[in-house]
Amino acid sequence: MWTEKQKKDAYEILLLQQQGLLEAEDNWLANLANSSALLNETLPETVFAGYYLFDGNELILGPFQGRVSCTRIKMGKGVCGESAEKQVTLIVDDVKKHENYISCDSAAQSEIVVPMVKEGHLIGVLDIDCGVTKGY
């Protein structure tokens, strides 16, 4: 497991790499695809890194890296639906202890979900699952 300093340093490097990818391309689909690949390859123990896009009713699976996953998530359901509905970042140290958890991959032990909001409107969420508890 990482120390807090190692985690901070890795996140800073990851942010610089992501910024470089975004500067080189303006297509949202290509950017989401490359972003999920970067996250999957950079963050240790990652079992899923991807995006769920909001279609006005529910979250639909978008570009991701990992195993086959849930394709649709209702608002308020699971960590992704909860994060999307509340428009807040959620960090779950142990998914087995989270009451509202939806298991899309049995290898996931911890999870972080970050809502994507533009001008007050939900676009979707970034979902990253880790194969160990307290991964984030």
What is each PLM-predicted segment?
Residues 20-24, 101, 131:
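General structural signal for alpha-helix termini and helix-helix connectors
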